[in-house]
């Protein structure tokens, strides 16, 4: 199985948690993070590099996909940068705060032939995973 290299933009609660979950997944490796406030702390926990420039982050050969978990109003730039560098994108919700930005982001990913996924999923939350385990064990549901 090929290992997919991920970079995380925004290492607050959601970005750090996505990193922790991805670190546990077979075939996935967090290779770098970008965040002006707490990248160092999260990078140390995840065992990855810190990048201080989006273009450098997205131009890395070991990055296949970019997870965008920055504050909502900061989603556009990393999505467009990742698409320009031909990196697949997972973007936390809401992907944009206005239709024009959303349209531009989706269009950029299409034009560059990369997958763009909005993070409308909950299976990364510990409570949801724990509930799934309890159901599988027959303890609930």
Task: List the model feature ranges, each with a label.
Residues 1-46:
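N-terminal Rossmann-like dinucleotide-binding module
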Residues 48-108:
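Beta-loop-alpha module in the N-terminal Rossmann-like domain of NAD(P)-dependent dehydrogenases
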Residues 30, 63-66, 140:
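Local beta-strand N-terminus motif with an aromatic residue
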Residues 96-141:
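A contiguous active-site-proximal alpha/beta segment in oxidoreductase catalytic domains
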Residues 10, 93, 138:
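Conserved G/P- and acidic residue-centered "switch" motifs that form tight phosphate/ATP-binding loops
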Residues 25, 60-61, 125:
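Acidic-histidine catalytic/liganding microenvironments
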Residues 21, 25, 42-45, 81-85, ...:
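Alpha-helical structural signal in soluble globular domains
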Residues 28, 64, 87, 114-115:
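Short, well-ordered coil/turn segments that N-cap beta-strands
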């Amino acid at each position: 199985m090929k290992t997919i290299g991920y970079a995380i933009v925004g290492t607050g609660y959601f970005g750090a948690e996505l990193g922790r979950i991805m670190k546990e997944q077979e075939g996935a490796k967090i290779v770098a993070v970008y965040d002006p406030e707490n990248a160092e702390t999260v990078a140390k926990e995840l065992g990855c590099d810190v990048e201080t420039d989006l273009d450098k982050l997205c131009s890395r050969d070991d990055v296949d996909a970019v997870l965008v978990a920055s504050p909502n109003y900061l989603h556009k730039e990393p999505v467009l940068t990742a698409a320009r560098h031909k990196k697949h994108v997972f973007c936390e919700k809401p992907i944009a705060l206005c239709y024009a930005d959303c349209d531009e982001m989706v269009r950029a990913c299409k034009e560059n032939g990369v997958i763009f996924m909005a993070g409308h999923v909950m299976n990364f939350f510990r409570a949801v995973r724990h509930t799934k385990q309890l159901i599988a064990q027959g303890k609930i549901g």
